[in-house]
Regions:
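Compact soluble domain cores
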Residues: 1-61
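Short, compact, well-ordered microdomains
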Residues: 54-90
Length: 90
């Protein structure tokens, strides 16, 4: 699955730098995301992600619960970049 460059927001980067447990969780959830495990998104969103992966088009989104709260991992529709962020940063 093409996901482009992976980046994180300042909020995620700051927490990763300060919290080793959170950093490990982010790394773990990135692995899940890149293997097609979308975390705690709705069944409809999971199905849409799976279709978009098969077709090679459309955006992708995963949601995961961490020790610092929920994070989102989102891939742009053109698959140029994948961003890790807190929902409040959207």
């Amino acid at each position: 699955m093409k996901t482009g460059q992976t980046v994180m927001t300042r909020g995620i980067a700051d927490k990763v730098a300060d919290n080793e447990k959170f950093a490990k969780q982010v790394t773990y959830f990135m692995g899940l995301y890149f293997s097609g495990d979308w975390g705690s998104v709705s069944e409809d969103d999971k199905e849409m992600n799976d279709i978009n992966v098969q077709m090679g088009i459309g955006s992708l989104m995963g949601a995961y619960e961490t020790c610092e709260g929920r994070i989102w991992i989102m891939t742009e529709h053109d698959r140029s970049v994948t961003t890790i962020l807190f929902p409040s940063e959207y």
